[in-house]
Structures are given as C-alpha cells and as structure tokens.
Amino acid sequence: MKTNLNILPILCFLLLWSCKSGNASSQTKNEVSQDTIKTFTLPAIPQIMVAPEQRAEFLVKHYWDNVNFADTNYIHHPEITEQAWVDYCDILNHVPLKTAQEAIRKTIDRTNVDKKVFAYITDLADKYLYDPNSPMRNEEFYIPVLEAMAASHVLEEIVKVRPKARLELAQKNRIGTKAINFTYTLASGAQGSLYQLNADYLLLFINNPGCHACTETIEGLKQAPIISQLIKEKKLIVLSIYPDEELDDWRKHLNEFPKEWINGYDKKFTIKEKQLYDLKAIPTLYLLNKEKTVLLKDATAQAIEEYLMIHQ
C-alpha cells in the first residue's frame, strides 16, 4: 500500500482542522457506529483552543478517540488505518517529546484488547518508526511501542524476545545520556578511545567502506562549511569508525576520508559483538558534546550541520 507522506504543514493543518472536526462530530452516532471503517473520524478540537501548540497537543492525545480497537475490520482497511497512522506520526513531531511518548504508549495500550489489532498497529510502528529506510524513523517514538509490547498480555513470551532485545539496544546512547566508550585502532596500529578525545563537539561516524549512503554522507560532511570551520578551530573532532572485518576494503577506501578526521576501525569488533551501538542503519551519526553526552543520535548530515550552525 502506498501512503501519503506529503502532509500539509502543521500550522495550516491545525488551523483548518476545526472545520473538518466539526463536520465529523455533526454525524449521528448511528452513522459512526454503522460505518467505522469507511472514514477516519478525527476528534473535535475545542474552539477555545486557538494556538497551534494547544491544538496539536489535544489532537495527539485524542487522535484515536473515535476508533474502536476491538474492531478487527480496521486491519483490512489500510487506506484508512495506515494513512491515519502516518498522519499521526507527523503530528507527534509538533508536540514536546514527553507528550508524544505518553500519547504513543496510551495508543498502543488501547490496542492491547485484541491480538490481531495489537500486532497490526505495532507492525505499523515498526514500519514507520523503526525501519532504517523510513523517512519518519524516530527511535524515541518507537521506545514506548517496545515497552508496551514487552508488557503486553496478548503476546506470548516467545514473541516478546525481539521487542525486548530492541528495547535494550534502543536505550543505549539515548539523547541526553553519556555515549558508551570504546577503543579504536588507526591504520598505523596506534590506538585511542572515544573518551580520550577532547573538543567542544565530537562527531561519531560509524560506516562501511564503499556503501552508497556512506559515500553520500562523507560528501555531505565534507561540504558543510560549519563542520570544516569547527574542525579548523579545533572545536570539533570527527571520529570515523569501521565496525566490521574486511580491513582490506577499509584500507582501499581510506583516501576518501578527509585527513583531518580520525579514521579508525574496531579491532576486536566490540561495537558489533557487544552491541554498544545500534548498527541497523549504516552509516549512523552521533553528535556528542565535550562531556560525551549525546546531542543527536542516528542523525543526518544535514541535521548535524543545522545543529552546529545554531549552537556554535
């Protein structure tokens, strides 16, 4: 199924929604109960709420109020349910993180009345919030889903093994926590550690040589003026790490990396074997501050550049 990811800007979306909600709420209860799967009925936002922030928060908290998650017919109408989920994930970005996480957990808990519905909604969460190829990927939004799955009474214990493992990995190196230390080795054989590096910012770049996305990211970082400036001013260190075994391939591609970067590899494969960092998506970028606290996790080169421009 193809879903529509070209969603209106949230300001227009929220300002126009009162009219749509009002029309939906004017339907008779009989119409809604008889036809719950032909349309998705949004909650009516109180007219007293005029600020976009207020309207977004109300909508996030009450988005699914008109959905009966015990009705398994929703599973068979992805053009309604999946599109509603995509729109919901977009709105989550316009409320505080804590509000978004509480709303997601409440939503998933509500689906915990039926195993099929629970599996369907959590699969949607996996598709849009966890899949490395999803433009809406957001680990902080996905964590409440994993927590709900681990605590669910409709899932067998064997089914909970994967979400529990994912939850454990997702809770490592979260924004606001200290990044996990590790040792790296240079082509010369010299070694160092993450915690030994001293600068206002540290950009950890975990990558594989020759991968298309890695090459694009390297070019994006090289062409970002703010990154070049901060490296020159010794306020930023870029630590590029190869986590795998094919060292010959890594050495062949070393000339693609700027000499100003620290280019190393994980000699004992500790990052991968002990799952110190989530490697489901390669490349992956972490921006750390002087204390090695994570500022950005699994970010794009553009997001790194924008953050540094604002906070330099």
PLM features: residue spans?
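Bacterial N-terminal signal peptides that target proteins for export
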Residues: 1-8
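Oxidative protein folding and maturation machinery
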Residues: 21-190
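Short, glycine-anchored, charge-dense loop/turn motifs used at functional sites
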Residues: 189, 211, 288-294
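Short active-site neighborhood of thiol/selenol oxidoreductases, capturing the structured segment around
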Residues: 193-221, 237-239
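Short, internal strand/loop/helix patches
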Residues: 254-286, 290
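Non-catalytic, surface beta->alpha helical segment in thiol-disulfide oxidoreductase systems
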Residues: 281-284, 290-312
